[in-house]
């Protein structure tokens, strides 16, 4: 029963952490009045493209987040849980190599400690990101509306 609940909690937690990173993109889109509907595809790339020329500081921060190993591990685990076979269980799947070779073998599951570390690290990264974004938005409004 404990493994079941841990797996369930891990799935939900990783899904929500990733979703919160994505929600901030919608906040940024609204902040700059980009007119992108929340259901449109490629919203992240469209927002980042806009920021590249219009807000270099936020652009750099988002690029740094996307290349962060903690973010990448969290995203990878979340995608596996959502779209593939669970990394929380031992499994046997084909592995496709660039050379065209296909190999088979048993892939070990991630340990509870590994999953817990990914969740904790991801939450810390999300907190840092939200703190940065909050200060950035505050500065945005000060510059936009507090013209003395």
Task: Please name every model-derived segment.
Residues 3-8, 15, 23-148:
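Acidic, Ser/Thr/Gly/Pro-rich intrinsically disordered interaction regions
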Residues 20:
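Short, positively charged
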């Amino acid at each position: 029963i404990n493994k079941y609940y841990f797996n369930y909690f891990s799935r939900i937690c990783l899904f929500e952490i990733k979703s919160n990173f994505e929600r901030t993109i919608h906040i940024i889109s609204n902040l700059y009045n980009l007119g992108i509907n929340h259901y449109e595809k490629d919203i992240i790339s469209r927002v980042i493209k806009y920021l590249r020329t219009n807000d270099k500081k936020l652009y750099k921060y988002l690029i740094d987040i996307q290349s962060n190993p903690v973010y990448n591990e969290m995203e990878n685990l979340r995608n596996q849980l959502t779209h593939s076979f669970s990394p929380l269980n031992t499994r046997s799947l084909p592995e496709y190599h660039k050379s065209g070779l296909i190999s088979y073998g048993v892939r070990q599951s991630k340990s509870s400690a590994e999953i817990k570390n990914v969740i904790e690290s991801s939450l810390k990264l999300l907190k840092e990101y939200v703190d940065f974004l909050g200060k950035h938005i505050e500065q945005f409004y000060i510059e936009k509306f507090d013209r003395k």
